[in-house]
Design a protein with these regions (language model features):
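Mature extracytoplasmic enzyme cores
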Residues: 1-248
Length: 248
């Protein structure tokens, strides 16, 4: 029948027939490798014709927790039947549900593990002037508030390529360019997914969305599913090395 997958029986899959792994239980313990997974099932394979979306971002538990479950409801002429109603997980202060469903579409993210960063070896100019061949740099002094203690000053050195992440013994610095740091790479277009009535509207909303690049799956109540990378992708010159830092 539609949506009823045939599961293998014990005559086909019996884990007791497999050889026992060698070693002690302690040596065989899971190392806890980080990861995440998601999938979408077309309505052609489900019992009622609606798509199924599953998403496990493998995020750790904290106290206080960073991710919160939430349901948002408000009247909106752009929402189905004029009423937005979305449930899922979000971050405090963000006016959008990051992953969830509005009853018409459901969506989920995992890390895309793409190559979105480029490093550059540079020699930042000294504070008291500019040397030949050095990279002009700006120093930002950030103040980090500490609960129950005095604030901590944190200096960030930034060149035209990006923030300096490390300094080598010879004085050269590794600066980072990440597509998510570029102008226009981040916006709140994700909030429009709450108003989508079907897959086409959801994909149109993602066309207007800019976040650090994620692996996105979507499904709708009509049984349609989609996958795409959501977020900016770097456009590199042909001679740009991808395995080593760019020379300064």
């Amino acid at each position: 029948a539609r949506g009823n997958a045939t599961l293998p029986g014990p005559s086909e899959v019996d884990l007791r027939r497999l050889p026992a792994p060698k070693g002690t239980p302690a040596s065989l313990a899971d190392a806890g490798t980080p990861g995440s997974n998601n999938f979408a099932v077309s309505g052609a394979l489900t019992a009622d014709g609606r798509a199924i979306v599953a998403d496990d971002m493998h995020l750790g538990l904290r106290a206080p927790n960073v991710w919160l479950r939430a349901r948002l409801r408000w009247p909106d002429p752009d929402a189905p039947a004029g009423q937005a109603d979305v449930s899922g997980f979000t971050l405090p202060g963000l006016p959008a549900v990051i992953v969830g469903s509005n009853g018409h579409v459901a969506w989920g993210f995992t890390n895309s593990y793409g190559d979105y960063m480029d490093w550059r070896l540079e020699t930042p100019c000294p504070v008291d002037g500019a040397d030949d061949g050095c990279a002009p740099a700006v120093r930002h002094m950030e103040q980090i508030e500490v609960a129950g203690g005095a604030p901590v000053a944190f200096e960030v050195l930034e060149t035209a390529w990006g923030p300096v992440m490390d300094t080598l013994d010879d004085g050269r610095a590794l600066s980072l360019r990440w597509v998510a740091h570029l102008p226009g790479a981040i916006n709140l277009g994700l909030a429009d997914l709450a108003l989508a009535a079907d897959l086409d509207q959801a994909l149109a909303a993602t066309d207007r969305t800019a976040i650090p690049t994620q692996n996105l799956v979507i499904g709708d109540r009509n049984g349609r599913i989609a996958w795409r990378l959501l977020g900016p992708i770097p456009v590199r010159d042909a001679g740009c090395p991808q395995r080593l830092p760019l020379p300064g």
